[in-house]
Amino acid sequence: MDHIRNFSIIAHIDHGKSTLADRIIQRCGGLSDREMEAQVLDSMDIERERGITIKAQTAALNYKARDGRVYQLNLIDTPGHVDFSYEVSRSLSACEGALLVVDASQGVEAQTVANCYTALDLGVEVVPVLNKMDLPQADPENAKAEIEDVIGIDAEHAIPCSAKTGEGIDEILEAVITRMPAPRGQPDGPPRAMIIDSWFDNYVGVVMLVRMVDGVLRKGDRIRMMATDTVYPLEQLGVFAPKSESREQLKAGEVGFLIAGIKELQAAKVGDTITLEKKLPNNAGPASDPLPGFKEIQPQVFAGLYPTEASEYDQLRDALEKLKLNDSSLRYEPEVSQALGFGFRCGFLGLLHMEIVQERLEREFDQDLITTAPSVVYQVQLGGLAGEVIEVENPSKMPEIGKIAEIREPIVTVHLYMPQDYVGPVMTLANQKRGVQLNMAYHGRQVMLTYEMPLAEIVLDFFDKLKSVSRGYASMDYEFKEYRAADVVKVDILINGDRVDALSIIVHRSQSQYRGRAVVAKMREIISRQMYDVAIQAAIGANIIARENIKALRKNVLAKCYGGDISRKRKLLEKQKAGKKRMKQIGSVEVPQEAFLAILQVDD
């Protein structure tokens, strides 16, 4: 075990993490030059295109160090985005060390800080690395000062490197060996392995990426998942180097993959512990306690996804099922809307996760989707003696006002990180979104603001606005804090007196008048004129708070009258009016797809 090092790379988006991983793999001869391509570990198209890492990947590499011994280095590539923070914490807990990669020309960013704190909490040894030293605007001294200031780890021995040109790679590998500890564990004890990630393969079923903590697992063992208490025969195991290589056994300290003929991903939950089913003469028996830190992931943001054509409902269901195979944090259940027909209510970890799922559905499965406004989960305390608490994740399911004692909304702690020139506009934005400032700290030229905010205010468009008021320099991350009672109301949109359920929104009372008016005005622009008058209203319960009319199109029925008696003209006009009235009773207004997106574009 002394010759094994497990490490991962922590970095903000675009600070060069995947390129650095490529160089390390190349230096250790993991792939031939022909197979080497940019961002080897990012296997999804969407990961390459957005330049982000979503799923964890690993590479087991052999490196001959300067002391002449050969070490096995396991590089575990972690996602860097705040939505995937649970996956990050699992990847990090499988490591003893982490390389903190900071772009020498940009300094530290919010997500780097968040992931770095996660690493320090898990007791991981962090080695700072300054990347992009080949750029003319690289400022290593400032970057070191920021690392010490913001994260509070010693950056004096930070390693300068450039993943692009390949300078400093050997120094990094030596630091991994000398500065990071070897894995701890009991090589002879009962086997325990932690699932870092799992995905679905069409040929072999679920593939689990695991870190062996104690003991040995051999091909042919019967293994038990501790969270779900299910047993499977172990069919194949091995390591990724970065291409998969089969082995006969995995020993404590190693990182590799297990294949056990599991059919659905729910059985192999990220963070779960794998051990043996029972004691046999040739093994050490099952472990009694699982590894700490496993938790079920709860979705934070919900939205409805509907096919544009009702006939494509089945294809959408199949597409979601396939996506769920590779994304255990996605939740969905069927739902029916009067306006949009059959579709699904989906739960996501956060906004980026939602965008990625939508994009993958449109891209890989060729789906045309209508998405409703994202909403969060509210806790509703019902009145009366029983006073039960229900969770409402869809605005149209909110009980009537009379039955509600109080509504609680999710509050999150938000860390905003930006150059000091933009503090003013960012604070104004945070206050508009009902943020309460908790802290403000200056680190050199950078400022870190800490706010408490309702999650509902963030899910709509906070991130886009933050980027625009700070010209793209601000970064943020957030974590759930608690549920808190709030004065929120449900605003319904009525068209000719009929509720359109997919357009309901839940907003704070102070903004309800304004939001209602804005949505109604927007609808008026979008809905085309009909043969009869259309009234668009916004209502809270039975109170109408805003109204717009769309005037009817009408034919000039008097065109054929030249002069003549007024009563003749009146007869024609009355006849037209009666016809319009009859039409209005039986006609229904077609709500175009843009209307559902319009809700998202209402400014505060």
Curated annotation (Swiss-Prot):
Against InterPro entries, the record matches this protein to: EF-4, EFG_III/V, EFG_V-like, EFTu-like_2, G_TR_CS, LepA_C_sf, LepA_CTD, LepA_IV
**Transmembrane segment boundaries:** none
Question: PROSITE patterns annotated for this entry?
Answer: G_TR_1, G_TR_2
Q: Which UniProt keywords apply?
A: Cell inner membrane, Cell membrane, GTP-binding, Hydrolase, Membrane, Nucleotide-binding, Protein biosynthesis
Q: Name one GO cellular component term.
A: plasma membrane
Q: Which intervals hold domain tr-type G?
A: 2-184
Q: How does it sit in the membrane?
A: Peripheral membrane protein
Subcellular compartments: Cell inner membrane
Q: Check the record and name the Pfam families matching this protein.
A: EFG_C, GTP_EFTU, GTP_EFTU_D2, LepA_C
Q: Name one GO molecular function term.
A: translation elongation factor activity
One record GO biological process:
positive regulation of translation
Q: Which SUPFAM superfamilies match?
A: EF-G C-terminal domain-like, P-loop containing nucleoside triphosphate hydrolases, Translation proteins
Return the SMART domains for the record: EFG_C
Its main subcellular localisation, reduced to a broad class, is membrane
Q: What does this protein do?
A: Required for accurate and efficient protein synthesis under certain stress conditions. May act as a fidelity factor of the translation reaction, by catalyzing a one-codon backward translocation of tRNAs on improperly translocated ribosomes. Back-translocation proceeds from a post-translocation (POST) complex to a pre-translocation (PRE) complex, thus giving elongation factor G a second chance to translocate the tRNAs correctly. Binds to ribosomes in a GTP-dependent manner.
**HAMAP family (UniProt xref):** LepA
**Of which family is this protein a member?**
Belongs to the TRAFAC class translation factor GTPase superfamily. Classic translation factor GTPase family. LepA subfamily.
Instruction: Please identify the protein, giving its name as recorded.
Output: Elongation factor 4
In the UniProt record, the gene name given for this protein reads lepA
